[in-house]
């Protein structure tokens, strides 16, 4: 026998099983059960505080909600598809515990402001976790950077050797990206930490509710100023998905370089066995599957952002059933982002840096060409002319399989008689890196300064 719908008073026929299954959201919004109970507790306490409900009725409801909280914590609650969503399921379970007085809980409240409140609470809590995990990753980056301040490697543009840099400097570039991610999520908290509770269906309520009371109970910083906006706003969700997409993009870029650099052709790093997998047919394989998975999962989060933008783009005010589609993407994004951060931090912390291979790559290429052009410019040669001269020398080196350091001093003196033996020191990769002392540059002192500032930021 079908369960009678709590909203079924004006209907003469029951809905079909297919409609029930298609419209039900309990399969995923059960993830907000904790938040739904928290919101209901705040609401009933407010109803008691304002004398909308008697103390006796309110206390019975509060006691029943606490029982459900305990059962939820112990995994003892069972939800029904026929009851549609988490709100109806909780009310039904509460009725089983305390009887018909449970029906008074929904006084001065709609599922519209109820679900909005649940989602705000859910995301508010997860934002803190995401920010903490980013900071944990930053700590690993700082540790690894400190170990590799003087590790010299090729810097790339267009994936071609450009100029030698410090590997620590490279790592600190990602530290800055993740710091911007933190700042975006912190701003996201401002728009998430607002209470929609009390907006009711869309127009507020005739009951003398106290929205400030419930906001304080739920530790919200602010209250929606407009009831229509309160129940229809999903900007805070879009902000989260946008921020999560940018964060995953940063992780994906980092993963791409890890995947390249642990290959035989590069050999700059080696991943720990703990974060690698093998092949079912090729015994020699050690695959960077975790890095590849994180790179792949970035597209998953992008998809959730695009889907919700498409859902929201034509919705008239206020609530529409389309908004049921706002949750699965958020839940999945949370379940994607947090493990990705944890796994990446562990992968980075345990990888081995092949310092000799990195340095060797800078000593048998032409990434010191800019150093030579700068050196010639200090001898009075206009930089554009120096650039052309060095370009010709590079071409000749490629033709003859020699480097700029192989060119004899006599050849250099033909370019400018003031060139001395010191030119060969300037062409050394480590010297080239050391000399870049401009603020934010790759010079060792500058990298140490970046690390010092990061430690201060992280309270290390």
Curated annotation (Swiss-Prot):
Coiled coil: none
Record pathway: Amino-acid biosynthesis; L-arginine biosynthesis; L-arginine from L-ornithine and carbamoyl phosphate: step 3/3
Record GO cellular component, one term: cytosol
UniProt-listed Enzyme Commission number(s): 4.3.2.1
Matches recorded under Pfam families: ASL_C2, Lyase_1
Enzyme class per UniProt: lyase
Catalyzed chemical reaction(s): 2-(N(omega)-L-arginino)succinate = fumarate + L-arginine
GO biological process, one term: arginine biosynthetic process via ornithine
Transmembrane segments: none
UniProt key word Transcription regulation: no
Subcellular location: Cytoplasm
Listed GO MF terms: argininosuccinate lyase activity
Annotated family: Belongs to the lyase 1 family. Argininosuccinate lyase subfamily.
NCBIfam families, per the entry: argH
Matches recorded under PANTHER family: ARGININOSUCCINATE LYASE
The name this protein goes by in its record: Argininosuccinate lyase
Phylogenetic classification of the source organism: Bacteria, Bacillati, Bacillota, Bacilli, Lactobacillales
Gene name as annotated: argH
């Amino acid at each position: 026998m079908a369960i009678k719908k709590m909203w079924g008073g004006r209907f003469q026929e029951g809905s079909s099983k297919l409609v029930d299954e298609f419209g039900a959201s309990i399969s995923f919004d059960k993830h907000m059960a904790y938040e739904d109970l928290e919101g209901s507790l705040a609401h009933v306490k407010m109803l008691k505080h304002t004398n909308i409900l008697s103390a006796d009725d309110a206390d019975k409801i509060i006691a029943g909600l606490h029982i459900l909280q305990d059962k939820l914590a112990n995994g003892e609650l069972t939800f029904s598809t026929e009851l549609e969503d988490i709100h109806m399921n909780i009310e039904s379970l509460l009725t089983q515990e305390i009887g018909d007085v449970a029906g008074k809980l929904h006084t001065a409240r709609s599922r519209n402001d109820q679900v909005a409140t649940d989602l705000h609470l859910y995301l508010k809590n997860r934002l803190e976790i995401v920010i903490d995990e980013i900071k944990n990753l930053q700590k690993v980056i700082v540790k690894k950077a400190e170990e590799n301040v003087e590790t010299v490697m090729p810097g790339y543009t267009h994936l071609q050797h450009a100029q030698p840099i410090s590997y620590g400097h490279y790592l600190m570039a990602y530290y800055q990206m993740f710091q911007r991610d933190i700042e975006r999520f912190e701003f996201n908290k401002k728009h998430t930490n607002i209470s929609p509770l009390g907006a009711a269906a869309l127009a507020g309520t005739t009951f003398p509710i106290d929205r400030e009371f419930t906001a304080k109970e739920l530790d919200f910083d602010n209250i929606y100023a407009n009831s229509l906006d309160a129940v229809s706003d999903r900007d805070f969700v879009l902000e989260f998905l946008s921020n999560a997409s940018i964060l995953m993009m940063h992780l994906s870029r980092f993963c791409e370089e890890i995947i390249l650099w642990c290959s035989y052709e590069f050999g700059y790093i080696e991943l720990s066995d703990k974060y690698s997998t093998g092949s079912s047919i090729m015994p020699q394989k050690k695959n960077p599957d975790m890095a590849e998975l994180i790179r792949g999962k970035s597209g998953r989060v992008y998809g959730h952002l695009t889907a919700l933008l498409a859902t929201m783009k034509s919705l008239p005010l206020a609530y529409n059933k389309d908004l049921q589609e706002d949750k699965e993407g958020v839940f999945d994004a949370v379940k994607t982002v947090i493990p990705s951060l944890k796994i990446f931090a562990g992968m980075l912390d345990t990888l081995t840096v092949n310092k000799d291979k990195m340095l060797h790559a800078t000593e048998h290429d032409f990434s010191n060409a800019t150093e030579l052009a700068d050196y010639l410019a200090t001898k009075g040669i206009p930089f554009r002319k120096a650039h052309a001269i060095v370009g010709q020398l590079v071409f000749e080196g490629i033709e003859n399989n020699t480097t700029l350091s192989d060119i004899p001093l006599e050849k250099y003196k033909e370019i400018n008689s003031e060139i001395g033996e010191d030119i060969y020191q300037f062409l050394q990769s480590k010297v080239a890196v050391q000399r870049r002392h401009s603020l934010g540059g790759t010079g060792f002192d500058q990298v140490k300064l970046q690390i010092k500032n990061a430690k201060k930021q992280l309270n290390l």
